[in-house]
Amino acid sequence: MRRRRLTTLAAAAALASLAGCGFQLRRPQPLPFARIALQGFEARSPLAEALRRALRDVAQVVAQPQQAQVVLVAMEDLTQRSIVASTATGQVREIQLRIQFGFRVSTPEGTPLAAPAQLVLARDMSYSETAALAKELEEAQQLREMRADIVGQVLRRLASVRPAGG
């Protein structure tokens, strides 16, 4: 009983010291608009889904551009995997994962609110045929992290957009 009380007291002291130093959990970046429409994405695009999830906390994602204050149009959404290095026997040793995302932001009428942007991320990773399953899982994790990075960059750019009349 005494140990539990000491543990609780120590946890409370740690939280109080964190609050006292100004520590706060990261909050979503506030956006200067309430409604956004996403267009130009392929059906079931992983990047579009990641954007929808991230935007859900800061704006309402609407299906029709006429209902939105801002429209984000994907002009390019490519995920590529290429071989960077191989052995003399032809076995793959290193691959490169690359995501390209080009987009523009406009009003529902099509008036540009920002210059078109192109985001490109590339990451190299080692590959081993003897650990193919593990490398496949690592590749999927890398792609998730790259998409999260792109979503963060898009949200920061959207935070600087000022919708017409607002």
Residue ranges and their predicted role:
Residues 15-35:
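Bacterial Sec signal peptide processing site at the extreme N-terminus
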Residues 73-118, 125-140, 156:
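Surface-exposed short loop/turn segments
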Residues 133-166:
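C-terminal/domain-edge helix-coil "capping" segments
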Residues 31-78:
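N-terminal segment of the mature soluble domain
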Residues 2-10:
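N-terminal export leaders
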